[in-house]
Amino acid sequence: MNSAVNDCLLIKKSPIHNKGVFARNNIASNVKLIEYIGRKVTKKESREIEKKAISLSITDKSLARTYIFKLDDDFDIDGDVEGNDAKYFNHSCNPNAKYLYEHNRIWIVSIRNVRKGEEITFNYGFGFDEDFKDHPCKCGAKNCAGYILDEEDWPKLNRATQQRRQRQQQELSLENEGANKGGQRTSASP
Protein backbone atom coordinates (compact mmCIF):
# COMPACT_ATOMS: atom_id res chain seq x y z
CA MET A 1 0.00 0.00 0.00
CA ASN A 2 1.32 3.43 -0.93
CA SER A 3 1.05 6.21 1.58
CA ALA A 4 1.69 9.92 1.02
CA VAL A 5 3.90 11.49 3.67
CA ASN A 6 3.84 15.08 2.47
CA ASP A 7 3.76 16.97 -0.85
CA CYS A 8 7.04 15.47 -2.03
CA LEU A 9 7.33 12.02 -0.38
CA LEU A 10 5.57 8.68 -0.75
CA ILE A 11 6.13 5.41 1.15
CA LYS A 12 5.83 2.21 -0.86
CA LYS A 13 7.44 -1.20 -1.39
CA SER A 14 11.17 -0.89 -2.03
CA PRO A 15 13.47 -3.11 -4.10
CA ILE A 16 16.18 -2.39 -1.50
CA HIS A 17 14.38 -3.45 1.67
CA ASN A 18 10.75 -3.74 2.73
CA LYS A 19 9.34 -0.20 2.46
CA GLY A 20 11.11 2.88 1.15
CA VAL A 21 10.56 6.59 0.63
CA PHE A 22 10.06 7.79 -2.94
CA ALA A 23 9.82 11.20 -4.60
CA ARG A 24 6.23 12.16 -5.49
CA ASN A 25 7.57 14.99 -7.64
CA ASN A 26 10.95 16.18 -8.85
CA ILE A 27 12.95 17.46 -5.87
CA ALA A 28 15.80 19.96 -6.06
CA SER A 29 19.11 19.54 -4.29
CA ASN A 30 19.45 20.79 -0.70
CA VAL A 31 15.78 20.49 0.26
CA LYS A 32 14.78 19.49 3.81
CA LEU A 33 12.52 16.53 3.17
CA ILE A 34 11.41 15.42 6.62
CA GLU A 35 12.45 15.44 10.26
CA TYR A 36 13.53 12.16 11.88
CA ILE A 37 11.49 12.03 15.08
CA GLY A 38 11.36 9.57 17.94
CA ARG A 39 11.96 8.84 21.57
CA LYS A 40 15.22 10.06 23.12
CA VAL A 41 17.02 7.05 24.65
CA THR A 42 20.31 6.49 26.45
CA LYS A 43 23.11 4.55 24.76
CA LYS A 44 22.35 1.64 27.13
CA GLU A 45 18.67 1.59 26.08
CA SER A 46 19.77 1.81 22.46
CA ARG A 47 22.02 -1.26 22.81
CA GLU A 48 19.18 -3.19 24.50
CA ILE A 49 16.81 -2.36 21.62
CA GLU A 50 19.40 -3.52 19.09
CA LYS A 51 20.14 -6.76 21.01
CA LYS A 52 16.43 -7.56 21.14
CA ALA A 53 16.08 -7.02 17.39
CA ILE A 54 19.09 -9.26 16.70
CA SER A 55 17.73 -12.04 18.92
CA LEU A 56 14.29 -11.81 17.26
CA SER A 57 15.92 -11.94 13.83
CA ILE A 58 17.28 -15.43 14.54
CA THR A 59 13.77 -16.84 14.11
CA ASP A 60 12.37 -14.22 11.70
CA LYS A 61 14.59 -11.96 9.57
CA SER A 62 11.73 -9.48 9.10
CA LEU A 63 11.94 -8.67 12.82
CA ALA A 64 15.58 -7.56 12.48
CA ARG A 65 14.89 -3.88 12.29
CA THR A 66 15.75 -1.02 14.52
CA TYR A 67 15.32 2.66 13.87
CA ILE A 68 18.06 3.94 16.16
CA PHE A 69 19.68 7.20 15.10
CA LYS A 70 22.75 8.52 16.90
CA LEU A 71 22.00 11.92 18.38
CA ASP A 72 25.19 12.64 20.35
CA ASP A 73 27.69 10.87 22.62
CA ASP A 74 25.09 10.27 25.33
CA PHE A 75 21.76 9.82 23.57
CA ASP A 76 20.15 8.29 20.50
CA ILE A 77 16.74 8.64 18.92
CA ASP A 78 14.57 5.52 18.74
CA GLY A 79 12.55 6.27 15.63
CA ASP A 80 10.23 3.29 16.00
CA VAL A 81 7.32 5.54 16.94
CA GLU A 82 4.01 6.25 15.28
CA GLY A 83 4.23 9.17 12.88
CA ASN A 84 7.95 8.82 12.11
CA ASP A 85 7.77 8.22 8.37
CA ALA A 86 11.48 9.08 8.12
CA LYS A 87 12.26 5.61 9.49
CA TYR A 88 11.47 4.19 6.05
CA PHE A 89 14.44 5.77 4.28
CA ASN A 90 16.74 2.97 3.14
CA HIS A 91 20.52 2.94 3.02
CA SER A 92 22.42 3.27 -0.24
CA CYS A 93 26.12 3.36 -1.04
CA ASN A 94 25.17 5.93 -3.72
CA PRO A 95 22.68 8.11 -1.81
CA ASN A 96 20.68 11.08 -3.03
CA ALA A 97 20.08 12.43 0.49
CA LYS A 98 21.89 12.83 3.80
CA TYR A 99 21.02 13.47 7.41
CA LEU A 100 21.64 16.86 8.93
CA TYR A 101 21.85 17.74 12.63
CA GLU A 102 20.40 21.17 13.24
CA HIS A 103 19.53 22.62 16.65
CA ASN A 104 19.27 19.16 18.25
CA ARG A 105 16.99 17.92 15.47
CA ILE A 106 17.68 15.44 12.67
CA TRP A 107 16.60 16.25 9.12
CA ILE A 108 16.80 14.22 5.92
CA VAL A 109 18.00 16.56 3.14
CA SER A 110 18.38 15.96 -0.60
CA ILE A 111 22.00 16.22 -1.80
CA ARG A 112 21.23 16.24 -5.52
CA ASN A 113 18.23 16.61 -7.78
CA VAL A 114 15.87 13.66 -7.32
CA ARG A 115 13.53 12.54 -10.10
CA LYS A 116 9.85 11.80 -9.57
CA GLY A 117 9.46 8.12 -8.66
CA GLU A 118 13.08 7.70 -7.53
CA GLU A 119 13.72 6.10 -4.14
CA ILE A 120 15.32 8.54 -1.72
CA THR A 121 18.17 7.03 0.28
CA PHE A 122 21.03 8.09 2.50
CA ASN A 123 24.19 6.38 3.76
CA TYR A 124 23.48 5.13 7.27
CA GLY A 125 27.12 5.67 8.14
CA PHE A 126 27.66 2.56 10.26
CA GLY A 127 31.19 2.20 11.60
CA PHE A 128 33.64 -0.51 10.61
CA ASP A 129 33.62 -2.54 13.81
CA GLU A 130 33.34 -6.15 14.87
CA ASP A 131 29.69 -6.49 13.82
CA PHE A 132 29.86 -4.90 10.36
CA LYS A 133 29.12 -8.31 8.81
CA ASP A 134 25.71 -8.24 10.54
CA HIS A 135 24.73 -5.43 8.17
CA PRO A 136 24.98 -6.62 4.55
CA CYS A 137 24.01 -4.01 1.98
CA LYS A 138 21.39 -4.71 -0.69
CA CYS A 139 21.27 -1.28 -2.30
CA GLY A 140 22.31 -2.52 -5.74
CA ALA A 141 24.41 0.57 -6.51
CA LYS A 142 27.33 0.10 -8.90
CA ASN A 143 29.67 1.23 -6.12
CA CYS A 144 28.03 -0.91 -3.40
CA ALA A 145 30.50 -1.77 -0.63
CA GLY A 146 28.62 -4.98 0.23
CA TYR A 147 28.02 -3.80 3.78
CA ILE A 148 26.23 -0.81 5.29
CA LEU A 149 29.26 1.29 6.15
CA ASP A 150 30.18 4.94 6.20
CA GLU A 151 32.00 5.74 2.96
CA GLU A 152 35.01 6.82 5.03
CA ASP A 153 35.35 3.19 6.19
CA TRP A 154 35.32 1.63 2.71
CA PRO A 155 39.16 1.63 2.51
CA LYS A 156 39.27 -0.32 5.82
CA LEU A 157 36.79 -2.82 4.39
CA ASN A 158 38.86 -3.15 1.21
CA ARG A 159 42.04 -3.78 3.23
CA ALA A 160 40.30 -6.34 5.44
CA THR A 161 38.85 -8.08 2.37
CA GLN A 162 42.26 -8.19 0.67
CA GLN A 163 43.90 -9.56 3.83
CA ARG A 164 41.19 -12.23 4.14
CA ARG A 165 41.69 -13.24 0.48
CA GLN A 166 45.46 -13.43 0.97
CA ARG A 167 45.02 -15.65 4.06
CA GLN A 168 42.60 -17.89 2.16
CA GLN A 169 45.04 -18.19 -0.75
CA GLN A 170 47.91 -19.02 1.64
CA GLU A 171 45.79 -21.66 3.40
CA LEU A 172 44.77 -23.15 0.06
CA SER A 173 48.42 -23.25 -1.08
CA LEU A 174 49.44 -25.00 2.15
CA GLU A 175 46.60 -27.51 1.77
CA ASN A 176 47.62 -28.21 -1.84
CA GLU A 177 51.27 -28.66 -0.81
CA GLY A 178 50.24 -31.08 1.92
CA ALA A 179 47.99 -33.02 -0.43
CA ASN A 180 50.75 -33.27 -3.03
CA LYS A 181 53.32 -34.50 -0.50
CA GLY A 182 50.95 -37.00 1.07
CA GLY A 183 49.68 -38.24 -2.24
CA GLN A 184 53.06 -38.73 -3.99
CA ARG A 185 53.71 -42.20 -5.30
CA THR A 186 57.07 -43.74 -5.03
CA SER A 187 58.08 -46.47 -7.37
CA ALA A 188 59.42 -49.62 -5.84
CA SER A 189 61.72 -51.89 -7.78
CA PRO A 190 60.88 -55.55 -7.76
Regions found by a protein language model. Give the residues of each.
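C-terminal SET catalytic tail plus cysteine-rich post-SET Zn-binding segment of SAM-dependent SET-domain
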Residues: 92-190
